[in-house]
A protein has these predicted regions:
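ATP-binding pocket architecture of kinase catalytic cores
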Residues: 55-214, 222-228, 245
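Juxta-kinase regulatory segment immediately upstream of eukaryotic protein kinase catalytic domains
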Residues: 21-50
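Catalytic-loop of the protein kinase fold
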Residues: 231-233, 238
């Protein structure tokens, strides 16, 4: 059984990468919300001197790889993250791993929200979960906010921010944020190609298997040599980036 709590910086960070924001359409309808045992969570937090606020938690729309809820603890907004219910693929939705990364990454990469609390006691919510820093802003999915709609340069603006944010993540030295032992960087690209090959073989009867085989062979012949490791984001896309409400810069 493990519970970990970290504090939040006193200053406001102007940028961050996270799924959470508050504006119309960002929350699931009440009828679609997946309920949690909030009384159990409140008891768990209270035992550690943390107060779960009286405001009803609200589930964020989208992001069903994990379930995300806006909550209030000690008078501040925060986000509870937990895996979805049911069986999970091996290694997926690892809250402990994510907590470890977020607890350190924000020091060198301010686009990352800071982790605040982690619990792996299944009796609380039925699964490990964490609470992370809340970042207000706008998430773009299928509709542009009015101030960006109709601007011909909006595609360039958003694409550049997306690429620059990802490049900044790659530039972080894992050792500088205490993540030197994270993962297995040696042979990562070769293992990735092998994984793609296995998934393509699983659907070979449904698609052009010859073309897939040629692509896999091409990739295997061109796997780059190992280089110093970098951090990567396995699901980096536009709706995983928050835009600040005032500047429309990534935060």
């Amino acid at each position: 059984m493990r519970h970990v709590r970290t504090g939040l910086p006193a200053h406001d960070i102007d940028s961050g990468v996270n799924r959470m924001s508050v504006h119309p359409g960002e929350f699931s309808e009440v009828t679609h919300t997946i309920p949690q045992d909030w009384a159990s969570l409140a008891h768990c937090l209270a035992r550690r001197g943390i107060l779960l606020g009286p405001a009803p938690p609200r589930q964020f729309a989208g992001g069903y790889g994990n379930l995300n809820y806006l909550i209030e603890i000690d008078g501040e907004r925060a986000v509870l993250r937990r895996p979805p219910g049911g069986p999970l693929p091996y290694g997926a939705n690892d809250m402990a791993r994510e907590y470890r990364i977020l607890s350190s990454l924000w020091r060198e990469y301010p686009l990352a929200p800071r982790a605040m609390f982690f619990c792996d006691e299944a009796s609380v919510l039925g699964t490990p979960f964490q609470i992370i820093e809340y970042r207000p802003g706008v998430v773009i999915r299928d509709t542009l906010p009015p101030d960006l709609a109709g601007r011909p340069e909006v595609g360039t603006l958003l694409s550049r921010q997306l690429v620059e944010s990802l490049a900044a993540l790659h530039a972080v030295d894992p050792a500088q944020v205490g993540l030197a032992t994270l993962g297995r960087p040696e042979g990562f690209l070769a293992r990735t190609v092998d994984g793609w090959a296995g998934r393509s073989a699983a659907v070979a009867d449904l698609i052009n298997s010859r073309a897939l085989s040629e692509v896999v062979d091409w990739l295997r012949r061109r796997v780059p040599a190992d280089a110093p490791p970098s951090l990567i984001h396995s699901d980096f896309k536009l709706d995983n980036m928050i835009l600040a409400p005032d500047t429309r810069r990534s935060r």
